[in-house]
Amino acid sequence: MSVATAALARTPFTGNATTGELTHWRAVATEVAQSLAVDALERDRKNEQPHAEAQLLRSSGLLDLLVPAEFGGAGGHFETAFEAIRILANADGSIAQLLAYHYFNQTGIAFYAPAKQQGAWWERTVAHGWLWGDSVNPVDPTLLLTVEADGYRLNGAKRFSTGSGVGEVIIVNALVQGGENDGKVLAFVLPTDREGLELVDDWDYLGQRLSASNSVRYSNVRVDAAEILGEVTEEPVSTLLIPGLQLAFANFYLGIAEGALARGKQLLLGRKNAWFLSTAPTYSRDVIFQRTLGELKARTAAVAALVEKLGRAYDLLIAKAGDVTAEERAELAVAIAEAKIVSTETGVEVANRIFEVTGTSSTSNDVGLDLYWRNVRTHSLHDPVDYKKIEVGQYFLHGEAQPISLYT
């Protein structure tokens, strides 16, 4: 039952997305986003588990975008997945988060499992239409695996387990106690209906209310040897999962900013009068409001250019698989940290300042413009952006990368 630790050329991803691939999945994501936009505010207020939304993602084909074609998936690229996340975030930040985490939980198959075992995992996720959640929050105490015949027993608890409330499976990391894998951290996959696995309905936060990010408790949960993906190591290619998730966050914040701008523009154009001291005939013709929107639009466009460039770079580095070096991994991680910084600050600023051009009436609960701010403000606290600035500054000054972690 020993888990191999040798470096493996694990990822099946190659090259960059074609124009045809990007065009197709943009259209799919846009259609899903339009459907979500119809009642995003109403669903947010109900704060129910997003089972219908998960089914919408499943029926659209988005869940299998990154699954290699030879195993029944779409054979898409991360650049395409990042764009899909961004487009969904225009309309519904919660469901964009659900999709983003699904992608990087599901592709744990490629990052952790030996190459010869990946095909069976890919085929199972396609056959069963799995939405993948997770239970890996590193801030909480480490989950523990104790050895028993043909497997393990899992105990502990994790908060902020995104997708666990609606996903069919979750990816979990835990420390092994005893046996030949003693001291190793293993990544494994559990069905969410496993005996002893309790989904705690405690996700009631300011924003991202439909991200199904509840807590999970484990009481002597059986983990079969066949459910183990592999060991969590510091192999450069396997640790690219975390910068990839951080880049998904950057696209997510950008998408929320773009959604807030679009909604703000709509509201401003609908204001037929003007401020009594203005010489403009309408609010939209007032240069003060034009200046504000121009500034926010320019900042958003700059973030877009950066994350699009990094999406392509991420695909190219992933394609190198086991040949990825620690230096290449560090360089891309820092570049993504830069994007995380500017996307966080731009997302929060846009979602906040959009009210300056839409006026008091836009704070009405019927309008729901606050949904953008609540969502980006909540998720942007995932990991402190100041530490991303330190990460970038340290690398810029001394060429020193941060230690590998579930945040860096």
Language-model segments: which ranges?
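Intrinsic disorder at enzyme termini
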Residues: M1-E21, K389-T408
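Charged, amphipathic alpha-helical oligomerization/scaffolding segments
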Residues: V28-E31, I256, R263, E295, ...
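C-terminal helix-coil-helix/basic helical segment that borders enzyme active sites and/or dimer interfaces
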Residues: L41-D44, A301-I341, F355-T358
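Glycine-rich flavin
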Residues: Q49-S59, D64-V166
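DPxDG-like acidic metal-binding loop motif
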Residues: A157-R194, G359
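Glycine-rich phosphate/pyrophosphate-binding beta-alpha loops
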Residues: R159-S164, L245-F249, H382
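Glycine-rich beta->alpha junctions and the first turn(s) of the following alpha-helix
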Residues: Y205-A301
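Glycine-rich phosphate/cofactor-binding loops in nucleotide/flavin-utilizing enzymes
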Residues: T358-T408
